[in-house]
C-alpha cells in the first residue's frame, strides 16, 4: 500500500520506511551506486540503490530505464549538505531502496523525452498524438493541477460563501439562431429531426431562475462549430452562473469577490478592489478594442477635429465620409522604427493593411523638435495644426506618431494591432503584472454589413439600460465583460425577463413572431408565469487557466484538446462511420467520407 506520493516526502519523514509508486524519470550510475529520480503526479524524489547497503534491491535498479513503472520500498534519509537539491521540493532527502519491483516496462522507443531535465522541444503534433505521454511531463502535469485548483476554488466560494447550487443542464438540446454554427446530432427515434450540442446553457439557466433556483452555477461543457485560433476550441468549458433579484452592481461585486478568491487561493495574489471600469465607448476611443491590455500605455488619440479641414485629403476625406483620424503616439519610436518598416513592404505597413488600412502615415518628432514626415503631410498641414497635434498627443522629441484614417472600426482595429506589436517589441509589457477591469455599457446591437441587418452584440436575451428604452436600436446593454491582461475571460449581462420586451428585441434582429415562437416559444411562455429579474455571467475556464499558467495556448491547459483543424490526433476523431450507422440515423452523406487516417509521427531522436 502506498504511504506517500513522491513529491510529498520531507525531512519530517527521515528514519521512516515509505512505499512509493511512480515512473523512472531518470537513472544515473555513479561509481556503482545507482540514483533514480522517481516521478508521480506530485513531483520527483531521489531513490538510491547502494549494493553495499541494500543488496537485495540492486539487481532490479540495474535494469531500470526511463518511464518504467515501479514500486519502491525504502528508508528516508537526510541528504549530505553537498548534495541537497534546492530545485526540488524533496531536495533535502533521499530514499535508500530496500526493495524495487518493476510493475511495467516500456516496449517501444519513446517518441520524445518525458523528463524535464532533457528540456526537449517537441512539435505540437507529436505531443497531441501521444498526449498521454505529454501529460506526464512536468509543465503539463502542473497545468492540469492548476486547472483542478481553479475549479475547486470556484466551487468552494460559490457554495460556501455565496449560496449557489450546482445544476446540470442538457447536452442534447435544440438548435437556435443568433449564435455560431451548431454541432448537430441526428435523432434515430425521430427521423429527420436533430439535436444540437449547446453553445452555452443560456436558455436553461434563465429557466432555472423562472423555476426559483435563485443562484445557479455549473462547470459547463459547450460546443461551437467555428473557425479556431490559439485560444479557441470546438468544445470548451466555462463556469456558468445565474442570479435572481440582483442588479448589475451587486453582480459585479460578487464576481470581484469570486475572482479575488481564485487569485488568492491559486496564485497567492491579493487583488485590489474595486476593479477599474471602462465604458465600451471609452475602451474603443482610448485603445481601439473592447478588451484592452492596460499593463502599458500607448493610448490612442482622436485628432479628427484638428484635421477635418486639412489640405491632406487622406485625413479630411476620411472625416468628411463619417470616419475618424487617430494617432498612436510612440515614445522613443522615432529612432527605433525606420521608414522602411512603415512604407509598403515593411512589417508595420503589413500589420496595418492586414487590419484593413490602405496605408500608414506618420510624423517623426526629431530630437531637435523638428517634424519629419512625407511631403504631402508636411505641405498640407498648417503650423497651427502641427502644433495642436503635438500638444494633443503630448509628443516630445523622439516620438513617432502613427496615423489611422478611415472608417472608425478599421482605424481602431489597425491601431490596436500596431499598439500590441509595439508594446511587445519595446518590452513594455510586465509579464508578472495582473490587470483586471470591467468593460460595461456595450451597445445592444451592431450592424452586420454582410447580412444588412442589426444583430445582438452579445446575445438577444441581454436587457437594455432602463433609460434607453425609448429607442432600443441605439440602446446601451446592461452587459459587462471582465478583461484580464487584454483577454476577455468572462462576460455576462442582466437578462430580459418581460415577454413583450423580448419580442421587440427579436423583431429588431430580424426574428419574426412565427420564428420566435418556433425557436423560443418555450422561453416566451415561461416568461408569462412570474419571471424574476435576473442576470448572470460565464467565465472561459480554459482561457482563464491559460493566463494563470502563463501558457501560450489553451491547448496546453486542456487534457485532450483538438487541433486548429478541429481534429483529435490521439483518437483520429472525427472519423467516418459504418454505412449501417448512417442508415439507422436516416442520414445520407452528400459524398463519400474521406479517410481521416494520419501518418503516425516518428519517434523523436
Curated annotation (Swiss-Prot):
Belongs to the class-II aminoacyl-tRNA synthetase family. Type 1 subfamily. It comes from the Bacteria. It is found in: Cytoplasm. This is Aspartate--tRNA(Asp/Asn) ligase. It catalyses: tRNA(Asx) + L-aspartate + ATP = L-aspartyl-tRNA(Asx) + AMP + diphosphate. Aspartyl-tRNA synthetase with relaxed tRNA specificity since it is able to aspartylate not only its cognate tRNA(Asp) but also tRNA(Asn). Reaction proceeds in two steps: L-aspartate is first activated by ATP to form Asp-AMP and then transferred to the acceptor end of tRNA(Asp/Asn). Coiled coil: none annotated. HAMAP family: Asp_tRNA_synth_type1. The keyword Aminoacyl-tRNA synthetase applies. GO terms for cellular component: cytoplasm. L-aspartate binds at residues 178, 224, 458, 495. Residues 202-205 are annotated as: Aspartate. It comes from Thermosynechococcus vestitus (strain NIES-2133 / IAM M-273 / BP-1). Pfam families: GAD, tRNA-synt_2, tRNA_anti-codon. One of its GO terms (molecular function) is ATP binding. The keyword Nucleotide-binding applies.
